[in-house]
Amino acid sequence: MSSRLEKFYKDEVVPALMKQFGYTNPMEVPKLVKVTLNMGVGEAATNKKILENAVGDMTKISGQKPVVTKSRVSVASFKIRDGWPIGCKTTLRRHKMYEFLDRLINISLPRVRDFRGVSGRSFDGRGNFNMGVKEQIIFPEIDFDAVDAIRGMDIAITTTAKTDAEAKALLAAFKFPFRN
């Protein structure tokens, strides 16, 4: 059972990118490897309930239970100790990854207030794309009334592309809303 975006990749994106970049083999075409969601919750050091709510939100958004991240060093100015839980993250692959990206591109990003597109400069030089979301309430799975606090999250999209141009062409072929 493949998702709508996965079928779209095989049927339309692969031939388009083969033509655009002059690939001879379909296996040369860049593809999505994983999507990593990270939610840093600094206030979790003082209140454990905040982290539980963040884990619940991330579970609803991603469809799988996130792992709780712990601090690596003690920082007195942030009032955290080594080993304290300070966030959560999850990695999506295969079907769940395509389902999440489909919801992100077609439902969630258009719900952002004053949305003009994501920056095309957020590539890391090796074909991976990073973006931040300021509010978790843009996702349809989150009930607006049940949210205790507005939290943002980081979204990292890892591809097999060698260059940023290939990765941008791949994401643009998925109808990713780039600003520039």
UniProtKB/Swiss-Prot annotation:
Keywords: Ribonucleoprotein, Ribosomal protein, RNA-binding, rRNA-binding, tRNA-binding
Database matches in NCBIfam families: PRK00010.1
Naturally occurring in which organism (per UniProt): Stenotrophomonas maltophilia (strain K279a)
Protein family (similarity comment): Belongs to the universal ribosomal protein uL5 family.
Matches recorded under InterPro entries: Ribosomal_uL5 (IPR002132), Ribosomal_uL5_bac-type (IPR020930), Ribosomal_uL5_C (IPR031309), Ribosomal_uL5_CS (IPR020929), Ribosomal_uL5_dom_sf (IPR022803), Ribosomal_uL5_N (IPR031310)
Gene3D superfamilies recorded: 3.30.1440.10
Record-linked Pfam families: Ribosomal_L5, Ribosomal_L5_C
Assembly behavior: Part of the 50S ribosomal subunit; part of the 5S rRNA/L5/L18/L25 subcomplex. Contacts the 5S rRNA and the P site tRNA. Forms a bridge to the 30S subunit in the 70S ribosome.
Biological process, per Gene Ontology: translation
Protein name as annotated: Large ribosomal subunit protein uL5
Single GO MF annotation: tRNA binding
GO CC list: ribonucleoprotein complex; ribosome
Alphabetical list of HAMAP family matching this protein: Ribosomal_uL5_B
Function of the protein: This is one of the proteins that bind and probably mediate the attachment of the 5S RNA into the large ribosomal subunit, where it forms part of the central protuberance. In the 70S ribosome it contacts protein S13 of the 30S subunit (bridge B1b), connecting the 2 subunits; this bridge is implicated in subunit movement. Contacts the P site tRNA; the 5S rRNA and some of its associated proteins might help stabilize positioning of ribosome-bound tRNAs.
